[in-house]
Amino acid sequence: ATCDLLSGTGIKHSACAAHCLLRGNRGGYCNGRAICVCRN
């Protein structure tokens, strides 16, 4: 979700990572389909 909302290369990945950190994950990244994928 966070990947579609923000345009720009680094910003959306940071928002995705922050979203995942808040959920207790180690971070996350945006895949090729603009989906935020959290790391375990």
Swiss-Prot record:
Shows strong antibacterial activity against the Gram-positive bacterium M.luteus. Also shows antibacterial activity against the Gram-positive bacteria E.fecalis, S.aureus, S.carnosus, S.pneumoniae and S.pyogenes and against a number of methicillin-resistant S.aureus and glycopeptide-intermediate S.aureus isolates. Does not show antibacterial activity against Gram-negative bacteria or antifungal activity against C.utilis. Shows slight antifungal activity against C.albicans. Disulfide bonds join C3-C30, C16-C36, C20-C38. Keywords: Antibiotic, Antimicrobial, Defensin, Disulfide bond, Fungicide, Immunity, Innate immunity, Secreted. The lineage of its organism: Eukaryota, Metazoa, Ecdysozoa, Arthropoda, Hexapoda. It comes from the Eukaryota. During maggot debridement therapy which involves the controlled application of cultured sterile larvae to an infected chronic non-healing wound, one of the key factors which protects larvae against the infectious wound environment and contributes to wound healing through its antimicrobial activity. One of its GO terms (biological process) is humoral immune response. InterPro entries: Defensin_insect, Defensin_invertebrate/fungal, Scorpion_toxin-like_sf. This is Lucifensin. Gene3D superfamilies: Knottin, scorpion toxin-like. It is found in: Secreted. The disulfide bonds are essential for antimicrobial activity. Belongs to the invertebrate defensin family. Type 1 subfamily.
